[in-house]
Amino acid sequence: MPLVIDAPDASFRLNYLFNRVEISHDFRQTWSIFYKDENHPLGALRGLTFHRGALFLVTDSGIYSSPSDVPQFTLVSPQRKGAEFVDIESYENMLYACTNDAIFQASSGSRWRLKYDGKACGHFFSLLHFQGKLFAACEKGIYVSSQEGKFWHPRFISKELGMFVALDGLGDKLFAQTDKGFFVSDDAAQHWHPQDNVKGPWTAAMGGTMLFEPRLKKREKNSEKIL
């Protein structure tokens, strides 16, 4: 999932620690609360994307949509029994959502078509639209889709880095979190090196430790800003 998404008039991000959606009107410099789920009527927030002028939110109770100018989330699809949606992403004017075991596609989020339920990737955890491709963070590594999610091809497989549980992209860099640490790629996930200067906050979510946002330690902010 992209940890920060950019809509035409604002940027949005999920705050997993406080179960809320935050908004920025100044190019990710400052953030305020867009939607706070104080009484948990929607459940635990899992994934967020911007699609056809609206926000789409995955929670443990289903998929919701809202206008991007006012937080009015309405249920468009209930959770799947026995195989819950864990993330959502907009790609080539279609919505894609993953359970741990399958990929689904929809135009508006209400009716989902199964696109892939193979075992080659292991469990799916996160989807990301990056540099014109749809990426997935999976139990076995990083995979890239073709033919609208029907096929998934290995981009990076390595047991040494651990299980990939979260992806985010900024500029030409990919950021990832595995169950062994934080990593960054400069060549669209073909090679990874440790990103030791990433710090939290983060929390347990979706089967692994989920990155809240990538940011640098103070001493390195002047040389490279990634927020």
Language-model segments: residues:
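Sequence/structural signature of beta-propeller modules
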Residues: 1-22, 212, 216-227
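Entry beta-strands of beta-propeller and related beta-repeat scaffolds
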Residues: 7-13, 54-57, 94-97, 133-136, ...
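Loop/turn residues immediately N-terminal
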Residues: 18-22, 60-64, 100-104, 140-143, ...
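Short coil turn/linker residues within repeat-based beta-strand modules
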Residues: 28-29, 70-71, 109-111, 149, ...
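Kelch-like beta-propeller repeat domains
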Residues: 67-74, 107, 173-175, 209-212, ...
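Tandem repeat domain/solenoid detector
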Residues: 75, 92-94, 101, 114, ...
